[in-house]
Amino acid sequence: MSDNPQKLLKRSVTIAGHATSISLENAFWIRLKEIAVLKDYSLNQLVSEIDKTRTGNLSGAIRVYILENLGQNK
């Protein structure tokens, strides 16, 4: 994975049995994985949880979820 926190990276995740691609900046991928570990979830499980409650696009919902969780798990 790139060291540049602003680099946009595309990853494939599985939601409800369907593969989908998500583009996020490296910094968001790092934090999303940290949150998944803290919750004892796989990355797919965490993204599925976010997907269930989103009203907009998935990438945006993930970014908002991460921002809302900053500091809660430290």
Where are the model-predicted features located?
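A detector of short terminal or domain-flanking linear segments
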Residues: 1-13
